[in-house]
Amino acid sequence: MMNEDGAYSKKDLEASSRGELFGPKGPRLPASNMLMIDRVITMTKDGGMHGKGYVEAELDVHPNLWFFGCHFIDDPVMPGCLGLDAMWQLVGFYLGWLENEGKGRALGVGEVKFKGQVLPDSKKITYCIDFKKVITGKLIMGIADGKVLSDGQQIYTADDLKVGLFKNTSF
């Protein structure tokens, strides 16, 4: 189900994890705790810094999020890898929004920089994904640059996020 305005609620994102949003052959988001997104604010086919597409999404932060209890005891901080994974999740979600089929897999990232952190007193994480290229055909792949903001302050950047969609994942 492609919303023209590209906005999706938490309920929609959870439906994606069950294969109910983009159909049984479309890419899925992870379920439950590994879903690092509460809502997608907007997606465009021709927006962003490179004019190839843009996604903006958010996660509400509260002190009882699962990772704060274990990373680290007496020094809670969101693992940076979860912010990176959220950006990969959004690249795959965008490929599904464009009506591509296959199982999503992160294929790599060029460079990641961490300049800040998400702490239990943070309120909101914003993810911004600027697409550089979408390849369709035998290979389906999205390549994008991303950034993560905590309460409006940029804390992570990732260049050349790559996600592919595969019909067969038994490789």
UniProtKB/Swiss-Prot annotation:
Q: Looking at the record's lineage, which domain of life comes first?
A: Bacteria
GO-annotated cellular components? cytoplasm
Q: What is its EC number?
A: 4.2.1.59, 5.3.3.14
Q: Where is the active site?
A: H71
A Gene Ontology annotation in the biological process aspect, one of them, is: unsaturated fatty acid biosynthetic process
Keyword annotations for this protein?
Cytoplasm, Fatty acid biosynthesis, Fatty acid metabolism, Isomerase, Lipid biosynthesis, Lipid metabolism, Lyase
Reaction catalysed by this enzyme: a (3R)-hydroxyacyl-[ACP] = a (2E)-enoyl-[ACP] + H2O; (3R)-hydroxydecanoyl-[ACP] = (2E)-decenoyl-[ACP] + H2O; (2E)-decenoyl-[ACP] = (3Z)-decenoyl-[ACP]
The protein's matches in Pfam families, at most eight in alphabetical order, are given as:
FabA
Record's signal peptide: none
What pathway is this protein said to act in by its record?
Lipid metabolism; fatty acid biosynthesis
Subcellular location(s) of the protein: Cytoplasm
Could you confirm whether the keyword Isomerase appears in this record? yes
Q: Name one GO molecular function term.
A: trans-2-decenoyl-acyl-carrier-protein isomerase activity
**Protein family membership:** Belongs to the thioester dehydratase family. FabA subfamily.
* Purpose: Necessary for the introduction of cis unsaturation into fatty acids. Catalyzes the dehydration of (3R)-3-hydroxydecanoyl-ACP to E-(2)-decenoyl-ACP and then its isomerization to Z-(3)-decenoyl-ACP. Can catalyze the dehydratase reaction for beta-hydroxyacyl-ACPs with saturated chain lengths up to 16:0, being most active on intermediate chain length.
Assembly and partners are described as: Homodimer.
What is this protein's name?
3-hydroxydecanoyl-[acyl-carrier-protein] dehydratase
Organism the protein comes from: Hamiltonella defensa subsp. Acyrthosiphon pisum (strain 5AT)
